[in-house]
A protein has these predicted regions:
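Fungal secretory targeting signals
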Residues: 1-22
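A detector of low-complexity, intrinsically disordered, Ser/Thr/Gly/Pro/Ala-rich segments
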Residues: 4, 8, 49, 79, ...
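Compositionally biased, intrinsically disordered low-complexity segments
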Residues: 14-20, 96-99, 743
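Prokaryotic Sec-type signal peptides and long signal-anchor helices
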Residues: 15-18, 167, 184, 346, ...
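Beta-strand-rich N-terminal accessory domains
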Residues: 21-73
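Catalytic-domain carbohydrate-binding cleft regions of carbohydrate-active enzymes
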Residues: 28, 34, 96-712
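A low-complexity, Ser/Thr/Gly/Pro-enriched, surface-exposed linker/loop concept
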Residues: 54-116
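C-terminal beta-strand-rich structural cap/linker in extracellular carbohydrate-active enzymes
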Residues: 701-743
Length: 743
């Protein structure tokens, strides 16, 4: 069985040392040693003859450079070009000693000192320290400190650390990565942004025989393109990390979450059925809830993102209008004239709870035609509660399309937090809602003229920290509320440690198509990678959110690519067998999308999927209570977590996954598909997979072809598992096996 180690931090290159050979090994405690081989110029950390980390012989393990990268974009969309100046070309090690350290298990660390050389025309001092922390004695902690240098026009501002790899090693995690399973041969930036490689970042890496993460939140970049090495760039001169070893990948996730935290438990009411995403006001919401109950759809809640009102925004082409929200965080008097009473009536009359929507923006509602009670934008402007711009000497305006003037809350400002906490208490939580989608978090501007009230570093460095501060802030307010224990608080942007402050991650915003990079397939890949990154409880917008547009044609004057009833139904199947909650979304252009309530057939399909989700409730709950809560293990598990020795399993991203340990799932993620080829992972041929719909049992290590008509995603019971919790789902299978769903 392979071992699983963990490396933490942001690192780079190695070179020649000037250290004598009188000593080559220094103890850290717990049987762990730091070894330095002068002849090969290699540093390694070893425990019980197993290497936790090593560097590349004859190469720098640390480097630094000057140069300000070129960033373009704003409003959640960022791209960058590396600018390196005077990157240090060589390195020496001049001294390795034990030093006293209070937080070390044995009261000391191993300190490595030396110089980075040929940094332009200067040499730069550095120190790297390793120790076993008292609080977490199952790992090695480290920190790196690099001096800036003495050339004012060439001060170092980023560091690089390089450690050894091998050609067959694979890398997983690193947050919301949408397009591939292993990160090998990729360059992954860690920066919170809207979409693309690196989106929804969470700087954590799980490797085939190692795992790593950083403690800090500056921009970093993981370069896995070298077959024999991994280089991590970090945009600061100090960084800390951990190196760990576990006996399997699931246990490495436990060790990771022992440090970053585990997600709080989801309330049990989410197991009871669907969370209906609806827009349109009280009458429409109540009508759809009633229809759902008639359709035998288990309805747990409604999610009403338009509770604060909507306005229209021009689409890229044609005459189509996109529905946008008013970010003023008070109930809209036109759509929800009796909001407080309506929320309570849904709870009392139908047993349906209500979820709302909030983001860290406040918009100017002066042009809101149906009126408002407070203009939070004007209040925040007067109080100085938003992120500022020193060039305009005013609020840093966030643009999210035409017709929206908004600012982003400055969470470094205590006055902002006090003011907005009062808004949340009086205008959001006061209505006995049971949860909120806490959107965005990735929009903090990074330009040099961005001003924050109380932060010593610049906005660029703070950008990745904002999602965590947003999660900490909202949970601190929610904890004061009477219904806190039943609340669902879900986010889609995060940074290291955010997971302990939210009980659900949402992998939005997918396009309403079948694609790999940003369609339904990407939802599976992101949930898998986020699970490895410490986010055990996740879900996607059922049906997707973003409408894609093409240039208009005679047949399609708007250019909008509407959501089909087929993808809506298949996405519902995916949600039922993959996710911690079952929540739908109308999308940003509802009128071009098939909705679950469009007609009797779409509602029937949706209700069926909701019943399937509910039938899995007891099985999911025992996973969440016994494994996610205590060990940090994800609900949805990439096959590599159980089969790192299976080369095919290591490359599976969206095609299939485990739901807990006892169910293996292959969802239908392509149109007009009613049969699936499914690879059943594992090298142990005694391992079995029983197809729940046909009863056919197969052995591991082969590809099988199974029927997958609408309503019947390929689900297999692993090794004839049985339990009272699983039997509820199998009862559903027996009851519904003859059901025919037509689209």
């Amino acid at each position: 069985m392979p071992s699983y180690s963990t490396y933490l931090g942001t690192f780079s290159v190695f070179a020649l040392a000037a250290l004598g050979e009188s000593q080559s090994s220094w103890t850290l405690g717990q049987g762990i040693e730091v070894n330095w081989q002068s002849s090969s110029q290699q540093l390694s950390i070893v425990q019980a003859n197993k290497t936790l980390l090593d560097t590349v012989p004859g190469q720098n393990f640390l480097s630094a450079s000057a140069g300000k990268d070129h960033w373009v974009g704003a409003n959640g969309n960022f791209n960058y070009t590396d600018v390196d100046r005077n990157r240090c070309q060589s390195q020496n090690v001049t001294r390795i000693t034990h030093s006293s350290r209070e937080d070390s298990i044995n009261g000391e660390d191993v300190s490595i000192q030396g110089y980075l050389q040929n940094c332009g025309d200067q040499s730069i001092g550095y120190t790297m320290s390793f120790w076993v922390p008292k609080a977490l004695p199952d790992r090695v902690a480290f920190d790196v400190n690099v001096e800036p240098g003495h050339k004012r026009n060439a001060l170092m501002n980023k560091l690089y650390l390089t450690f050894g790899s091998h050609v067959s090693e694979d890398f997983y995690g690193l947050g919301a990565q949408a397009s591939f399973a292993s990160m090998k041969n990729q360059i992954i930036p860690i920066f919170s942004r809207e979409q693309g490689v690196g989106r929804g970042d969470q700087p954590i890496t799980a490797l085939e025989d190692s795992q790593s993460w950083e403690e800090d939140t500056a921009f970093s970049e993981f370069d896995f393109t070298n077959p024999d090495a991994v280089t991590v760039r970090y945009d600061a001169l100090t960084v800390g990390g951990h190196v760990m070893q576990a006996d399997n990948m699931l246990n490495s996730i436990t060790m990771l979450t022992d440090f970053v935290g585990k997600m709080p438990t989801l309330p049990e009411w989410v197991d009871n059925g669907a969370i209906l995403g609806i827009q349109g006001g009280q009458e429409k919401v109540e009508r759809i809830v009633k229809e759902g109950l008639k359709q035998d759809c288990p309805v747990a809640a409604v999610w009403l993102q338009d509770w604060s009102g909507t306005h229209s925004q021009e689409a890229p082409y044609g005459n189509m209008q996109i529905s946008r929200l008013w970010w003023n965080w008070e109930s809209d008097s036109k759509l929800y004239p009796t909001w407080t009473e309506f929320v309570q009536d849904l709870r009392e009359e139908y047993g349906v709870t209500t979820l709302a929507y909030i983001n860290p923006f406040v918009a100017n509602v002066s042009s809101k035609t149906d009126g408002y009670r407070r203009n939070l934008f004007l209040e925040a402007t007067k109080g100085g509660y938003m992120v500022q711009n020193s060039t305009t000497n005013g609020t840093a305006i966030i643009s999210s399309g035409k017709g929206i003037q908004a600012g982003i809350l400055d969470l470094t400002n205590q006055k902002t937090r006090t003011w907005f906490a009062d808004v949340l208490r009086k205008q959001v939580w006061n209505t006995n809602i049971s949860g909120v989608m806490w959107d965005f978090g990735e929009y903090t501007p990074i330009t040099p003229d961005t001003k924050l009230a109380n932060i010593s570093s610049d906005a660029y460095f703070y950008h990745n920290q904002y999602p965590r501060d947003w999660a900490i802030f909202q949970r601190s307010v929610a904890k004061e509320m009477p219904l806190f224990e039943e609340m669902v608080t879900f986010h889609r942007s995060a940074s290291l440690g955010s997971n302990r402050h939210l009980n659900l991650f949402w992998v939005g915003d997918q396009t309403t198509v079948w694609g790999i990079n940003d369609g339904i397939k990407s939802a599976v890949t992101i949930m898998g990678q986020m699970g490895i990154s410490g986010y055990a409880q996740s879900h996607s917008d059922l049906g997707g959110y973003t409408t894609a547009f093409h240039p208009p044609t005679v047949a399609n004057s708007s250019g909008a690519i509407g959501r089909s009833a087929e993808i809506l139904g298949r996405w519902g199947e995916l949600a039922a067998v993959s996710s911690a909650v079952f929540r739908s979304h109308e999308g940003n252009v509802p009128e071009v999308n098939a909705q679950f309530y469009t007609n009797s057939s779409t509602y029937s399909y949706y209700a069926y999927n909701a019943r399937m989700f509910k039938s899995l409730g007891p099985y999911r709950r025992q996973i969440l209570n016994n494994e996610s809560k205590t060990r940090g293990w994800p609900l949805l598990r990439m096959p590599v977590l159980y089969h790192p020795d299976d080369s095919k399993a290591r490359q599976i991203s969206y095609q299939s996954f485990y739901l807990g340990a006892d169910l293996y799932v292959a969802p239908v993620l392509d149109p007009q598909t009613t049969k699936l080829n499914v690879y059943l992972p594992g090298t142990d041929r005694n391992r079995t997979y029983t197809h729940v719909w046909s009863g056919q049992t197969y052995h591991a290590g082969q590809t099988v072809r199974v029927d997958a008509p609408h309503g019947k995603p390929a689900v297999f019971v692993v090794n004839h598992a049985h339990s009272p919790e699983l039997s509820v789902f199998l009862d559903f299978v027996r009851k519904e096996n003859g059901t025919v769903i037509r689209v």
